[in-house]
Amino acid sequence: MSSQTPESLLPRHEAFLRRAEVDRPLLGAWIGGYYPAEQFPLGHRSWQVGQLLQPADARLDAFRNDYETLYRVHREAEDDFFYVGSAYWGVPWLEAILGCAVHVGETSCWAEVSRLDPRDSSRLCFDLRDNAWFQCLIRFTQDLLQFAAGRFPVCPPLLRGPGDAACALCGPEAVAMALIDGKPWVNELLARCAQVRLEVLERLHAVIPAWRGTHAIGGYACRLWTARTVAYYQEDSAAVLNPKLFADHLLPLARLTRPLADIHFIHLHSSCLYLIDALLADDAFSVIEVNLDHPGSSPPLAQYVPALRHIQQAGRPLLLWGEIGPSDWDLLQEELSPIGLSVQPIIKLPEDIRRYRWRRDNRDRG
């Protein structure tokens, strides 16, 4: 952002969503590292690795200096964005609200599989007003809004999809096999997880105001900003399913959140790119975001560039987030169009964003 005002940046963001003619992609620096603890070292280190996290432990106070640093360094980057904050995204908030024990890890926190009796999801029927983790989330969000004082937008934290939540409750193998075998209990469980997620988002939207008359999402990996309302969706459990199971069981639940916002975007890992055709055949998500995952945890970028081009050629805005080395950056410029493209590289220092300059001879590739 640097010297630019947010108001001067908005037209380029809207051009991305419209897939209007542009000379370069929408560029957003993600400063601080791939993992939550890398962005929030002081706050995360206030806990002990292995600690069983309690709602009283997750408070803004320990994270204040981290948020201030993130706000400052994102202002220094010469890009098209600014800092967007949310309650610490290293906490698996939805899983905690649903009753999973949360433990502190080296780079983030993780939810322990609760081994819920799959035939009884009745314990997921509760009043959020009586849920300690939900109240913790609301308090953290309200405290962050007060701390931000209008300097940066605040959004809901990462809330994984109902498939991810069900896997946290019962284990991914149990959920996948139940879907394959057509067990009725798994759809009841997924529906209840989806309903709780929806209720949490509705309550958060009620306490989070618009920012300068606009809306932003992305206090975690990748960001989106628009004059319209916007919501984020993640369903990493799709990695253990197939296109039909996803389309039949998880995609209908994703549509339940449509009344929450005008613009919806979904996060995908390279292991979930088989979903692209199902997503392009549906209008649930206006934008598709793809993680450029760590080498070794995903195929080389060259192997899935055709899938990225397929998204662009279908007329869907594409958002890319991850660690992008020089050779991958050259490949993206050769193969993709800047039209309807947002690139958000992970960098260590604000000045590193200068490495991501776009050649202006490939606008017709999309």
Identify the meaning behind each predicted range.
Residues 1-52, 66, 70, 76-87, ...:
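Active-site loop segments of alpha/beta catalytic cores
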Residues 59-60:
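Outer-membrane beta-barrel proteins
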Residues 84-122:
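A contiguous, low-structure linker/loop signature
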